[in-house]
Amino acid sequence: MNIKFSPSLMTMDLDKFSEQIGFLKDKVDSFHVDIMDGHFVSNLSLSPWFIEQVKKVSDTQISAHLMVEDPSFWTDRLIDIGTDFICFPAETVNGIAFRLINKIHSSGLRAGVVLNPETSISSIESYIDKLDKITIMTVDPGFAGEIFIKKSLEKIVNLRKEREKFNYHFLIEMDGSSNKKSFSMIHQANPDIYIVGRSGLFGLSSDIETSWQEMIKNFETETGVKVNQFVNRE
């Protein structure tokens, strides 16, 4: 089964940047980069500059998750550097969503939206047909290691039904505490992409290869699904 993992680079060991990116780039579907402004969430994280550094050593897709009050400001910079997916918070785009999506698509890139645990699918229904990806937060955003919110998985199930019914093309991604304890529950909801961070991948060992193999073992043990460990992009 083609399980897609997207490592959250906010939780990687930056002292081992080249080593960890080099090992993961042929094994994962994409890299997940959190960009926070300290206002939408009470934290600061990675930046467009960081994405540029990743792109210098890897051609793996990069998905930027904006946790910012002004997504338009950040989107312009992310377009300039060719970020594959630009995903903005649903809570901040009322009145600019169509304009923002059109700008991203006009640049040949893909647009996504992120739903926090309290945010309903109905809030994006007016533009859901234009989205390339929908990310469901299964934790409160802003910090690694937050408590897993099982109820958020219902949105994944409902999005799959809606996608099939209306023939939408968006990918469904989950973000938050994806690890040995939650893999089985998440798999039952069946997202297209699993974002894995400290508890699911990077924190399992100081050695990235050991961490990766442990994550794969945990996933296969908890779900009964065999993981293809090499991504063929040809």
Q: Which residues make up each language-model segment?
A:
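Hydrophobic faces of well-ordered beta-strands that scaffold small-molecule active sites
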Residues: 3-8, 31-33, 62-66, 86-88, ...
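Active-site beta-loop-alpha junctions enriched in small/polar residues
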Residues: 8-12, 36-38, 67-71, 91, ...
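Catalytic cores of alpha/beta
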Residues: 19-24, 70-80, 119-130, 177-194
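Glycine-enriched alpha-helix->loop->beta-strand junction motifs that scaffold or abut catalytic
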Residues: 27-30, 57-60, 79-86, 105-112, ...
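N-terminal active-site wall of soluble small-molecule enzyme domains
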Residues: 32-103
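Glycine/Thr-rich beta-alpha phosphate-binding loop at enzyme active sites
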Residues: 37-45, 49, 117, 125-157, ...
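Glycine-rich phosphate-binding active-site loops on the catalytic face of alpha/beta enzymes
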Residues: 86-94, 135-147, 189-212
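C-terminal helical cap(s) of enzyme catalytic domains, especially alpha/beta-barrels
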Residues: 201-234
